[in-house]
Curated annotation (Swiss-Prot):
Annotated 1D-myo-inositol 1,3,4-trisphosphate binding sites: 48, 90, 186, 218, 315
Name of protein: Inositol-tetrakisphosphate 1-kinase 2
Induction comment: By drought and salt stresses.
Organism: Oryza sativa subsp. japonica (Rice)
Keywords carried by this UniProt record: ATP-binding, Endoplasmic reticulum, Kinase, Magnesium, Metal-binding, Nucleotide-binding, Transferase
Cofactor(s) this protein cannot do without: Mg(2+)
Compartments, as annotated in UniProt: Endoplasmic reticulum
Reactions catalysed, as given in the entry: 1D-myo-inositol 3,4,5,6-tetrakisphosphate + ATP = 1D-myo-inositol 1,3,4,5,6-pentakisphosphate + ADP + H(+); 1D-myo-inositol 1,3,4-trisphosphate + ATP = 1D-myo-inositol 1,3,4,5-tetrakisphosphate + ADP + H(+); 1D-myo-inositol 1,3,4-trisphosphate + ATP = 1D-myo-inositol 1,3,4,6-tetrakisphosphate + ADP + H(+)
Cleavable signal peptide: none
Amino acid sequence: MRLHGEVSFDEDEEEVVMVPAAALSSSPLNGGAVPVTRLVVGYALTKKKVKSFLQPNLLLLARKKGINLVAIDDTRPLAEQGPFDVILHKITSKEWQQVLEDYHEEHPEVTVLDPPNAINHLNNRQSMLAEVSDLNLSSFYGEVCTPRQLVIMRDPSSIPTAVAMAGLTLPLVAKPLVVDGTSKSHELSLAYDEASLSMLDPPLVLQEFVNHGGILFKVYIIGETIQVVRRFSLPDVNTYDLLNNVGVYRFPRVSCAAASADHADLDPHISELPPRPLLEKLGKELRGRLGLRLFNIDMIRELGTKDRYYIIDINYFPGFGKMPGYEHIFTDFLLNLAQSKYKKCLSGG
């Protein structure tokens, strides 16, 4: 199978003439500044990811900045392709992960975005939020925590008893335990009453529902850059809802399918973005703990509070194409990687 999305350009477009990366080993140029070179980025993405991420505005800007995006063919040995400066990937198969790990062992000079073992940490919702719960990020700017949750591996009939023993409060949000890149793994269910809990389908994670004004903050992290957008989310649940609703209500991928809330006429107490210093501290901590540079955080603010936030999901290499100006942020990120690597080589590191 060939991974989709080979990048090509019209022959009559102006060609950018650049010094090959191999020339860097001869002598520093520009008084020690990073010399002009073409950065080769190999990508291994699904057809869906190619379409959403490698948009024309990104391809054009990358070319202008000297970034060469090359599709990786997984029917050929990876060592026979390239050479690459960076490998960008989002393929979930164990076979691909092993290929990538073997390649990186032979070519440690190639930057892999991101390491497969670090990505795997986010493929399980139990381990996903464990790092957040250990952060202890209470500060002047606010408190960051996670909803109380319970993992159910099997036997739906045992769920009501397990929930009662854990002391969780209804309603509960049910999410598949494993995140495998499919739309089904991002579906949500909302269970209103105890009797309906046995209708759920393990393995899953149950989280206490936190009223948040129906607004979700998607915090995109690309390296050290952070950008936040608002999305409409599940509506708040009140006492009337609990008394008059029974059963399980199923939802698609809410934060992805919902329209942007950035320009909606909202109560400022609900729509106000989390403080920038808090997000920067959170981003730095999670980059270090997760070992990732491309991810996003789904965050909500508890209704009626100004500074209590809950992280409800973390996603690797999310839909950056929906983020305003993503092409500038992402190409700058790639160039900064190259600059950091070059400076490290100059210093003998």
